[in-house]
Amino acid sequence: MARADMIRELREIGYAVQELGDGCISFPFAVTVGRFAGQTITVGLLVGEDWPFNPPSGPHISPSLLPINPAAIWPHGGIHGPRCRPFMAGGGQYWSRPHPNWVGTKRSARDYIAHLNMVFDALA
């Protein structure tokens, strides 16, 4: 399996995925939990060819929602400028939020979306 499989999985569960090149994908994401609930943002992910063995690292978020704060702790820290070339032109942020227990999941796009929801819920 590879990046194309994650793209297919995301599309199967209703996400309009765009392939940006350099291993990067993006899609509109309706935030349903936490203090940003009700907003639709763009989530960008750097997906390796080793999907689903390894998940994407943290998400790129656009527009910027939190102050850049690389040194602080979860849930308000680990916020950086964009790190993947296709996301740099549009601004936004990279949130250092790796999945905490990927091996304990089915390693699916649904599991990664659940992780995103957990990240947003922690910002309540």
Please tell me what each predicted stretch does.
Residues 37, 52-53:
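A short, structural micro-pattern
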